[in-house]
From Swiss-Prot:
Assembly notes: Interacts with FGFR3 and FGFR4.
Name of the featured protein: Fibroblast growth factor 18
Taxonomic source organism: Bos taurus
InterPro entries tied to this protein: Fibroblast_GF_fam, IL1/FGF
Pfam family, one: FGF
Recorded GO CC terms: cytoplasm; extracellular space
Residues glycosylated per entry: N39, N137
Family, similarity comment: Belongs to the heparin-binding growth factors family.
One GO MF term attached to the UniProt entry: type 2 fibroblast growth factor receptor binding
GO biological process: fibroblast growth factor receptor signaling pathway; neurogenesis; positive regulation of cell population proliferation; positive regulation of MAPK cascade; regulation of cell migration
Entry's localization field: Secreted
Keywords: Disulfide bond, Glycoprotein, Growth factor, Secreted, Signal
Protein's gene: FGF18
Amino acid sequence: MYSAPSTCTCLCLHFLLLCFQVQVLAAEENVDFRIHVENQTRARDDVSRKQLRLYQLYSRTSGKHIQVLGRRISARGEDGDKYAQLLVETDTFGSQVRIKGKETEFYLCMNRKGKLVGKPDGTSKECVFIEKVLENNYTALMSAKYSGWYVGFTKKGRPRKGPKTRENQQDVHFMKRYPKGQAELQKPFKYTTVTKRSRRIRPTHPG
C-alpha cells in the first residue's frame, strides 16, 4: 500500500531545492562578475583620471632599455639615453597603458602581424598594452588588441614578433627604472617628527 510522504520529508525536499537554487544564482553572479572585470580590463576608460609617469623599461634579455626611435623600436638604449625615456600613460583601472617616447613623441604599438612599430598617433587599440606584474617582480606588456602577444626583444635588442612570445619567456620581461637624475625627484613623501617644546622656566631673583 502506497503511503503519502510525511510533512517533514516535504519540508526537507523544499529546503534542498532552495539551497540548490541559491548555489546556482551565486555561481551565475560570480561568472558575471569575472566577465565584467575582464571586459573592464580590456575596455578603455575615458572617465577615470589618467596618470602619466616617466621611466625607462630595462629588458631582461638585452640588458639595455627600450628605445622609441620614431617608427623603429629597439632595446639597445643605455641608462639615461634620451630615446629610452618613456612617457607611460595609465589608461584604465585594469592596468592598460600607452607608451610614448619622450624625445620622438611616437607611440609604441603592435600591428596585426605582431611587429613592434612606432606611430605618431596613439589612439588606436594597437598602441594599448596590458601591464602584468609577474611573480619575479618583472613586468610584461601584453597587447590589448591581440591577446597573448607580448612586447619582447632578442639578446641583440631586436623586437620579437607577437605570435612568437609567451609570458614565461625572459624576452618579454622588463624592469621599470627612473632615468639618471630622476630618482631623486621621485622620492616618497617622508614624515618629520617634531619634538614638543619644553616650557622655559624663568629664574627667580631674590628681592
